[in-house]
Amino acid sequence: MATGTDQAVGFGLVAVSLIIFTYYTTWVILLPFIDSQHVIHKYFLPRAYAVLLPLAAGLLLLLFVGLFITYVLLKSQKVTKKAQ
């Protein structure tokens, strides 16, 4: 059974994910259909960032996955050399 702290952290992560999903969905799908002079546009970044931010996040994810795999492979090679 998860502790209270684990449940709170999990709930917080889900809440943040839902907020980001709602914001991004509104930004990308609904905002182009709203008049550009409407006051809601001041709460969103320019549309170019709708592509650049996920692209940057994806590249960072690939970078960290690659670094992790490299670290694990190098560490396992050191352990293999010690055993021999």
From Swiss-Prot:
Note the topology in the membrane: Multi-pass membrane protein
Matching InterPro entries, A to Z? DPM2
Give the residue spans that cross the bilayer. 11-31, 49-69
Keywords assigned by UniProt, alphabetized: Endoplasmic reticulum, Membrane, Transmembrane, Transmembrane helix
Localization (cell): Endoplasmic reticulum membrane
For this UniProt entry, what's an example GO CC term? glycosylphosphatidylinositol-N-acetylglucosaminyltransferase (GPI-GnT) complex
A biological process term (GO) from this entry: regulation of protein stability
Entry superkingdom: Eukaryota
A GO molecular-function descriptor:
enzyme activator activity
Q: Its principal location?
A: endoplasmic reticulum
Pathway annotation from the record = Protein modification; protein glycosylation
Indicate the quaternary assembly.
Answer: Component of the dolichol-phosphate mannose (DPM) synthase complex composed of DPM1, DPM2 and DPM3; in the complex interacts directly with DPM3. Component of the glycosylphosphatidylinositol-N-acetylglucosaminyltransferase (GPI-GnT) complex composed at least by PIGA, PIGC, PIGH, PIGP, PIGQ, PIGY and DPM2. Interacts with PIGA, PIGC and PIGQ.
Report the protein's function.
Regulates the biosynthesis of dolichol phosphate-mannose. Regulatory subunit of the dolichol-phosphate mannose (DPM) synthase complex; essential for the ER localization and stable expression of DPM1. Part of the glycosylphosphatidylinositol-N-acetylglucosaminyltransferase (GPI-GnT) complex that catalyzes the transfer of N-acetylglucosamine from UDP-N-acetylglucosamine to phosphatidylinositol and participates in the first step of GPI biosynthesis. May act by regulating the GPI-GNT complex.
Give the UniProt family note.
Answer: Belongs to the DPM2 family.
Official protein name in the record: Dolichol phosphate-mannose biosynthesis regulatory protein
